[in-house]
Curated annotation (Swiss-Prot):
InterPro entries: RNase_H2_suA, RNase_HII/HIII, RNase_HII/HIII_dom, RNase_HII_arc, RNase_HII_hlx-loop-hlx_cap_dom, RNaseH-like_sf, RNaseH_sf. Manganese or magnesium. Binds 1 divalent metal ion per monomer in the absence of substrate. May bind a second metal ion after substrate binding. It catalyses: Endonucleolytic cleavage to 5'-phosphomonoester. Its main location: cytoplasm. This is Ribonuclease HII. Its EC number is 3.1.26.4. It comes from Methanothrix thermoacetophila (strain DSM 6194 / JCM 14653 / NBRC 101360 / PT) (Methanosaeta thermophila). Pfam families: RNase_HII (PF01351). Residues 2-211 form the RNase H type-2 domain.
Amino acid sequence: MMLILGVDEAGKGPVIGSMFVAGVVFSEEDIFDLAACGVKDSKLLSPTRRESMERKILSIARESFVLEVTAQQIDDLRMVMSMNEIMVRAHSRVVSRLQADRAILDAADVNAERFAQRVREVSGKPIDILAEHNADRKHIVVAAASIIAKVARDRSIRDLEAALGRPLGSGYPSDPATVRFLKEWIEENGDLPSFVRKSWSTAQRLKASSV
């Protein structure tokens, strides 16, 4: 029985919160069940639909794993490596954690072939690894992983908002609600919270303008 691993991330670009890299393993036969459930790229689904889809995906999957990389970890790692290399390490961790004959990744590098090669090297897994741009639209196993990762990311933002009692927006630098939250937090506390990526230019600019 051929086992195929799909891997995708959610939260690479936000200034607020963790990044999540999800891996899900399916047999070739399971792909028919995924298709019957209507699995597609997470960006094409509403948050409610993603959550209901998550339960179906996990009930079909042979194995799954979600790696969380916190804002603090990203800041620390960026002092010694590029964001591309962080993506390689995170995807490698997921690939090495799960058992499959083949892995398909959504490429997190402009050079998809180089990304696959680096993940293969770092993971140390002797399996076939394919990385493609927009793999979540081309391969249903990657679409499934994108849903799992996105739900984990959405859930973490909701949990943060509940703990703080205030809206964070999407967490992306382009979101006015996110920028407003950061400005208000700096005004009130004089610094940025631990769940913000302080190495992001948006965070640095807002912090500098408050001095």
